[in-house]
């Protein structure tokens, strides 16, 4: 992938950009095999990759510069701002949005937050696009609600310029820390969720709900999990750390009992909406801590699917699964190091299948799916 920002030394986020994709995949596969070297693996499936540029459905832009000439991008470690609107990871559809947002920031008087001086209002702009219909969700992260009235007043102009904006919100993040969002979300549009669709499964994206940033590869990840589950004798499963329900909604059948657990209420609202659209009445989604939910249960289903954050599922949940011994565990991980550590805590299982998904091209990161079977 050619990147003028990288070539000019202005951005180094894509550390592997000079390596061809096949070399990147080989290096990631070698890393994964090294991490799982102590565990026999029956089948290594071929790695899955997608487009090498224009694949991201989300932009997280630090706003800096002045209200008349805002910059959207990032801050270097020394505090120097860098505009990343031309980043080739973003699809072409993002360019006109960035172009319209810069004059809008001036129109609405949204002074960019100055980290060094602790002054200003607009901290971040978060943009998400639906692959299914091109609709977009835009979130303004502000220090306070001081400029809210001005923003509302200027909004008709933005709608006129960008009719693809289906969901617009203001998030209030008052703390002087590098935290992306606060607890308060103020909706400025009638719609509160962005419609998405993977493999004919309706999904919804709301503010403060996690959603994969590489739709092309994520849709293949969900489809693969679905195919693996369909090959197993499963009538009841848990989907822990379920997010908006991507895995569970793909894997569920009309007669399967499924419980999805996720701590974020916004994500659970999305999952419930999707389940209702699909007419799946045997699905239950609850906003709870996944470990606390699981360890409080006196019995387990045949299959437990886990998709934890980078820290992994942790020893308490591993110990519980070892004791309760479900027939199958499907582990989806964005951090193979913690996954390998967790697998070590599950000695009663063998690894039947492993597949790498190149969710994050040009970096050392990747997603991995494993199927573990009770010995």
Swiss-Prot record:
Residues the entry annotates as binding [4Fe-4S] cluster: 3, 11, 14, 87
A Pfam family: tRNA_U5-meth_tr
Record-level GO BP terms: rRNA base methylation
UniProt entry keywords in alphabetical sequence: 4Fe-4S, Iron, Iron-sulfur, Metal-binding, Methyltransferase, rRNA processing, S-adenosyl-L-methionine, Transferase
Catalysed reaction equations from the record: uridine(747) in 23S rRNA + S-adenosyl-L-methionine = 5-methyluridine(747) in 23S rRNA + S-adenosyl-L-homocysteine + H(+)
One MF term in the entry's GO annotations: rRNA (uridine-C5-)-methyltransferase activity
E.C. numbers: 2.1.1.189
Superkingdom in the source lineage: Bacteria
SUPFAM superfamilies according to UniProt: S-adenosyl-L-methionine-dependent methyltransferases (SSF53335)
Enzyme class at the top of the EC tree: transferase
Residues annotated for S-adenosyl-L-methionine binding in this entry: 212, 241, 262, 307
Residue positions of the active site: 334 (nucleophile)
Function recorded in the entry: Catalyzes the formation of 5-methyl-uridine at position 747 (m5U747) in 23S rRNA.
The name this protein goes by in its record: 23S rRNA (uracil(747)-C(5))-methyltransferase RlmC
Organism in which the protein naturally occurs: Shigella dysenteriae serotype 1 (strain Sd197)
Gene name tied to this protein: rlmC
